Amino acid sequence: MIGRRLAVILATVVLIFCPRGVPAADPTPELVARGKYVFGAAGGCACHTTPDGAGLNAGGTKFDLSFFGVVYTPNITPDAGTGIGKWTDAQVINAIRRGERPDGAKLFPIHPYKYFSNIADDEIEALVAYLRSVKAITSTVPARSLKIPVPARTIVPAVKIAPRDGRARGAYLAGGAGHCAECHTPRRFDASTDDTKFLAGGPGPERSLAANITPHNETGIGRWTEAQIARFLRTGVKPSGHEAYSLMRTVIVGTSAGFKDLTEADALAIARYLKTVPPIDNKVR
């Protein structure tokens, strides 16, 4: 009887102090490595590392959002004073998936939590483990200056375990960590994506132009083979021989990891998925 009561007490303690979705023990090297892969599938979270900044994930990239205001990417290193070092795993996950800081402040949706909310439980836990493994950097970024309230975005509950292969894997990667639609889907006046033109390209962040990546034969990538799409994702080289530039080049190269580190199987899975989305005639350039 005493043994049974002790087991119940211990189980209760675990449930209270180690809630589901938050690792209870020190992460294994395998978990950290998997987290780095997820980090790379997100383009190395390149917005959080400025070329002349303080270092990996130290933040400080400025986004001038016109009439919305100005925001800066935060320091996401494990520094206790200026980064996320004092945040719990659950708080880090909440910021990634829901765009909410521990103090309740909402992140401006230039942080793609609409898509990051799709990252599976097992992979987001690995991602947090990796974020905690990088060098802590003391770097204070400027405060944001918004002219309007932070727009709300729809959050989709994540799956518990990430799909492992096939089109489902490709859809998961493109619609989650890869957040392809964040740049490749045109925006409405309120900065939300116009999903009637899903992946059809147009003006992107930082005055860039995002390509039409629907399988339209004339204005999209309909004439590209799956192998050519996969090669582009990993190398930045188009079938024409031209290379990616601007933001696309940034996410391919990444930081400590990027699209270049995708496995061939995952790159092909994304390619297969892109071949199945509705083709849209939209000439970007």
Q: Regions from the language model: what does each represent?
A:
Residues 139-150:
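Extended, well-folded interaction surfaces typified by the phenylalanyl-tRNA synthetase beta subunit core
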Residues 22-40, 150-176:
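Electrostatic cytochrome c docking/interface patches
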Residues 7-18:
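Bacterial N-terminal signal peptides
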Residues 30, 89, 106, 123, ...:
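Ligand-binding pocket scaffold of soluble enzyme catalytic domains
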Residues 36-70, 98-106, 134-138, 175-207, ...:
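Periplasmic/extracellular electron-transfer cofactor-ligation site
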Residues 1-4:
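N-terminal secretory signal peptides that target proteins for export/translocation
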Residues 43, 62-94, 114-124, 191-238, ...:
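Electron-transfer interface patches adjacent to heme c in soluble/periplasmic c-type cytochromes
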